[in-house]
C-alpha cells in the first residue's frame, strides 16, 4: 500500500473540476457562455433594415448589446453564487473541499477562491459576418444592404439570392491568416474580454 504525505493543497483530484485549487476553490468553467453570433443576428436585424445602414452602425449596436449580455450574465452568476446552497448543494465529498463539513457550509459559501469562466461562443460566425458585409458592401460595392436583407428574408432561395450568398461566403474569413475575418475576430475578442474583466 502506498503512503501519501502530501498536503491537501499540493495534489489534484479527479473529476470535472480540473481547474480547481484542490479543496480551496469553487470553479465554474466551460458552462457559462455568451453567444456572440446571436448578438450579431439580433443587431443585424435592428440595423440593416433601417435607413442608411453601415458596418459602423452595426458595430456600435453590437457593442451595446454585448455590454448588456455580459452585464446580465454577471448578474446571473452573482445570483447563482448567492442562492446555489439553497437549491442544489454541491457534493462535499466529491470536491474534497476544506471547511464545508467543519463549518456546515456549501462549497459556494466555504470556498477560498471563486473561479468563474465565461466563454464567448459563435466568434467565427460573427467575425465572418462583419467581414463579409464590410468587404462586399462597403469596400468593393459588389452588394448593397438591400440585396443582402432581401436574400436573408428569402433564406437565399432563388438564383439571385444564391448569388448573394456565394459572394458573402467567398469573402475573407476567420482563420485564413491576416484576413478581414481574423481582424474582426480579434476586435470582437478584445471587446468581449474587456467587458468580462470589467464585471469582475
Q: What residue spans do the PLM features occupy?
A:
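Conserved catalytic cores of very large enzyme subunits
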Residues: 1-200
Amino acid at each position: 500500500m502506498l503512503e501519501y504525505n502530501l498536503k491537501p493543497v499540493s495534489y489534484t483530484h479527479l473529476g470535472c473540476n480540473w481547474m480547481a485549487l484542490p479543496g480551496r476553490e469553487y470553479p465554474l468553467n466551460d458552462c457559462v457562455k455568451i453567444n456572440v453570433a446571436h448578438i450579431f443576428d439580433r443587431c443585424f436585424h435592428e440595423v440593416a433594415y433601417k435607413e442608411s445602414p453601415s458596418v459602423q452602425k452595426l458595430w456600435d449596436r453590437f457593442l451595446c448589446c454585448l455590454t448588456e449580455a455580459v452585464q446580465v450574465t454577471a448578474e446571473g452568476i452573482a445570483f447563482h453564487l448567492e442562492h446555489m446552497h439553497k437549491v442544489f448543494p454541491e457534493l462535499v465529498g466529491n470536491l474534497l473541499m476544506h471547511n464545508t463539513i467543519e463549518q456546515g457550509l456549501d462549497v459556494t459559501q466555504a470556498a477560498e477562491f471563486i473561479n468563474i469562466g465565461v466563454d464567448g461562443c459563435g466568434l467565427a460566425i460573427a467575425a465572418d459576418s462583419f467581414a463579409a458585409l464590410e468587404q462586399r458592401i462597403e469596400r468593393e460595392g459588389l452588394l448593397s444592404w438591400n440585396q443582402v436583407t432581401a436574400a436573408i428574408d428569402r433564406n437565399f432561395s432563388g438564383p439571385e439570392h444564391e448569388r448573394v450568398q456565394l459572394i458573402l461566403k467567398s469573402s475573407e474569413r476567420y482563420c485564413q491568416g491576416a484576413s478581414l475575418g481574423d481582424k474582426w475576430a480579434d476586435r470582437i475578442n478584445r471587446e468581449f474580454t474587456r467587458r468580462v474583466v470589467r464585471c469582475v
